[in-house]
Amino acid sequence: MLKPSVTSAPTADMATLTVVQPLTLDRDVARAIELLEKLQESGEVPVHKLQSLKKVLQSEFCTAIREVYQYMHETITVNGCPEFRARATAKATVAAFAASEGHSHPRVVELPKTDEGLGFNVMGGKEQNSPIYISRIIPGGVAERHGGLKRGDQLLSVNGVSVEGEHHEKAVELLKAAKDSVKLVVRYTPKVLEEMEARFEKLRTARRRQQQQLLIQQQQQQQQQQTQQNHMS
């Protein structure tokens, strides 16, 4: 659990302090499940309703919401009262999940930053009309040993900075600039990556054909020039 951090927000008269309280979401959910179990034992509430609510609280989706919310709360830059920060965090969390509609839910992955790098490659970007994706997990690298990332994960943010709609170089710079560790928000969309790679392969094939045609034309021109020189001599 992160320790509370204190940031100052100067005003015209005096500096006011905003204390960012640490979240206790894991403990809160565990306590809620404990209370549900006690209610179930008492028989005051229909068992099937309590079991349904308990199942929701223990689901992967609820865990993902909790992780993303806590990540947003820790990284979002907001000055103001705790209520204002909570509203801003909630909006950022909803936006992350709304962007994932039709795909896997967002996940938070934290990797240590070492001299050997992070152990994955990215492709795509605004200049290619494509999201930024994890295109390769390097065998034996940090990402593979950690096990949190997958080939086909779309990169949503790096250390709290969104890379959706950004150029490829922006994501690379953020990854390189990270110190000690890097927190990523990703979502798994392998089909989109496959479509993107297929599109890139078509472009590469078309480029190779153009180069071959250009080479043939150059050879033909050289042959014509050589033929003309032979006739002149």
Curated annotation (Swiss-Prot):
- The record's principal subcellular location, in a coarse class, is membrane
Identify the tissues in which this protein is expressed: Expressed in brain, testis, kidney, placenta and liver.
Q: Where in the cell?
A: Cell membrane; Basolateral cell membrane; Cell junction; Postsynaptic density membrane
Output one GO MF annotation: protein-macromolecule adaptor activity
Protein family: Belongs to the lin-7 family.
Q: Which PANTHER family match?
A: PROTEIN LIN-7 HOMOLOG
Written domain comment of the UniProt record:
The kinase interacting site is required for proper delivery of ERBB2 to the basolateral membrane. The PDZ domain regulates endocytosis and recycling of the receptor at the membrane.
Q: State what protein this is by name.
A: Protein lin-7 homolog A
The scientific name of the source species is Homo sapiens (Human)
Lineage of this protein's species?
Eukaryota, Metazoa, Chordata, Craniata, Vertebrata
